[in-house]
Amino acid sequence: MMRLNIAPAPWPGAPVVVLSAGLGGGGGYWLAQRAALEAQYQLVSYDHNGTGENAGPLPADYSMATMAQELLSALQAAGITRFALVGHALGALIGLQLALDRPEAVSALVLVNGWLTLSPHTRRCFLVRERLLHAGGAQAWVEAQPLFLYPAEWMAARLPRLEAEDALAISHFQGKENLLKRLQALKQADFSRRAAAIACPTLIVSAADDLLVPASCSRVLQAAIPGSQRVEMPWGGHACNVTDADTFNTILCDGLAAMLPVAREI
């Protein structure tokens, strides 16, 4: 069973919010959001299967449906039957899959730099990254990754931080085979014919300068999901929740408050 990190509820019956990262898979990706959320919600974070605390070989036919079912099974085993999901990129796709497969379990979605189906531009970016992986291994993959995640000026001002993050990422690399299986599942996912069936409240967040996933993908996503709301950050790159956490956290907290209105027990 996949291991989850479940924070204490701020009060009995507080809404559960699951945080799901992108292709890197690490639950620590959401560190800059935790303080803004933990007073109002019971937070659940996790390392995706095949990464971090849940390291281990993945099956050959690994799919988005499998990723979603793994998370749902772990949540149910922990006694959590209803939750909101905040997902970044691949994590957003897991949220879409869950909202379609198990709509009774998903109370709301926040989709950050996600998509209905992989754009040709994003596919090209991943092709380049795969070639780097095959030619230069984990080090080449990890060292190139920030170029797709962050704005140039933000990176230029934080070179020591990026070097430290690179070293950590290399030491905890999920493995070439697992990465390629997860990437293949991501590339095969296509929600264009099913998105109209998503019934839960949905907030879509994008960054105008995202190099990896064009912001237009989020506009297409909003058009496909009935009643969904969208906020586009003017700056921040693919990892906008990291580079401009203050702006992102305001959007996230306001969005969750609108979608998950609750009366705190006194």
Curated annotation (Swiss-Prot):
GO MF term set: hydrolase activity, acting on carbon-nitrogen (but not peptide) bonds, in linear amides
EC number, as in UniProt: 3.5.1.-
Occurrences of domain AB hydrolase-1 (ranges): 15-239
Keywords, ordered alphabetically: Hydrolase
Reactions that this protein is recorded to catalyse: carbamate + 2 H(+) = NH4(+) + CO2
One GO BP: uracil catabolic process
Family stated for the protein in its record: Belongs to the AB hydrolase superfamily. Hydrolase RutD family.
Role noted for this protein: Involved in pyrimidine catabolism. May facilitate the hydrolysis of carbamate, a reaction that can also occur spontaneously.
PANTHER family in UniProt: HYDROLASE ALPHA/BETA FOLD FAMILY (PTHR43194), PEROXISOMAL MEMBRANE PROTEIN LPX1 (PTHR43194:SF2)
Name listed for the protein in its UniProt record: Putative carbamate hydrolase RutD
Organism expressing this protein natively: Klebsiella variicola (strain At-22)
Gene coding for it: rutD
